[in-house]
Amino acid sequence: MSERPPEKTLAELASPNHECRACGYVYIPSQGDQKTSVSPGTPFEALPLNWKCPVCGAPRNYFISTGETDAPSGFAENLNYGFGFNRMSGGKKNLLIFGSLFVIFLFFLSLYGMG
């Protein structure tokens, strides 16, 4: 029997962002680059070889992959389960969790002030 290759998550399938090591500029493929007229949806690998960082002018080899930040972290078949939290990216989930904890903390602090 032949083994199936492991299934990739949506974050692994999405085109990764790349960050300039010289200045910190982040190339996001879904936004493209308006300064050098690179259309949205262009992956980093498809950029012209002479493309440079629009902020500091560093060449392409100064960029490192930082992964996709806006993609959901799970598998496609699991996105419809739950209350919609599976469609959120990791950063949005963190904001929701820690924001809720902060609101609960403020609630208990207000109870302390009442008594």
Curated annotation (Swiss-Prot):
A Pfam family matched in the record: Rubredoxin
InterPro entries with a match to the protein in the record: Rubredoxin-like_dom, Rubredoxin_dom, Rubredoxin_ET, Rubredoxin_Fe_BS
Membership in a protein family: Belongs to the rubredoxin family.
Keyword Transmembrane in annotation: no
Gene3D superfamilies in the cross-refs: 2.20.28.10
UniProt keyword terms in alphabetical order: Electron transport, Iron, Metal-binding, Transport
An annotated Gene Ontology molecular function: iron ion binding
Cofactor requirement: Fe(3+)
Gene this chain is encoded by: rub
Annotated residues for binding of Fe cation: 20, 23, 53, 56
Lineage: Bacteria, Bacillati, Cyanobacteriota, Cyanophyceae, Synechococcales
Domain Rubredoxin-like: residue ranges: 15-66
General function of this protein: Rubredoxin is a small nonheme, iron protein lacking acid-labile sulfide. Its single Fe, chelated to 4 Cys, functions as an electron acceptor and may also stabilize the conformation of the molecule. Could be involved in hydrogenase-linked redox processes.
Cofactor remark from the record: Binds 1 Fe(3+) ion per subunit.
Protein name per UniProt: Rubredoxin
The keyword Cell inner membrane appears for this protein: no
